[in-house]
Amino acid sequence: MKKILIISGGISKERAISLDTGRQVAKELKKNNYFVKIAEPNFQLFDVIKKFKPNKIFNALHGQFGEDGYIQTILESFKIPYTHSGVISSSIAMDKVLSKKIFIKNKILTPKFLTFSFSKDEKNIVRTIEKKLKFPVVIKPINEGSSVNVFICTKKDIKKKLKYLEDYKKIIIEEFIGGREIQAAIIGSKKLGAIELKPKRKFYDYQAKYNPKAKTEHIIPVDLPKKKYKQIMKISSKAHN
């Protein structure tokens, strides 16, 4: 029987979601006759790995330390296969500003943006946005996932919403682009397909993703013309690779 170590929990703002992911993964793996152990990414992790001797490691961590190259660096040292992208890919993908710069260089469309520093830019934020972008805008942390602390802001409420992000030294501000929410799944070079998400809330935020009461509709397969579907998968694959 193959042994799988699931790492979940962690210290990010997505800890609760990570723990839930770990439990769900463990449940499914056990159904398929794997011997499973769940561990936290703490100082005991090294001992757990050495004693358990897993055949593979399932990274169920979300957010900082779990998706940004840190845990990947640690796992590389054990030379045990693990799920997730490698060190460099993880560190780049978790940084929204760096990712967008790479997209722009490779001619992949991405919303216009600017970075915002609380120590330098707060007084002139409205003027800067009106000069370089236009309202409404989307504000978000540079290196969080799961739509944690993501807000759509108007000129009227931008300063109020910024207060929720004061713990971050820098954030990213993007132009708002309305429309349908389509997500494409890529693993390696394989295109798995796309789905449409129809949230009942203002947009596909943290609550829409994880609160069952939000009743977000998942449409599979996505209802799109073939040409448009192929275009989405092509762009997604280019961004991924």
Q: What are the language-model segments listed below?
A:
Residues M1-M94, L98, S117-V126:
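ATP-binding N-terminal substructure of ATP-dependent carboxylate-amine bond-forming enzymes
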Residues K2-S8, D20, V36, I49-K51, ...:
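Active-site nucleotide/adenylate-binding loops and adjacent lid/helix of ATP-dependent enzymes
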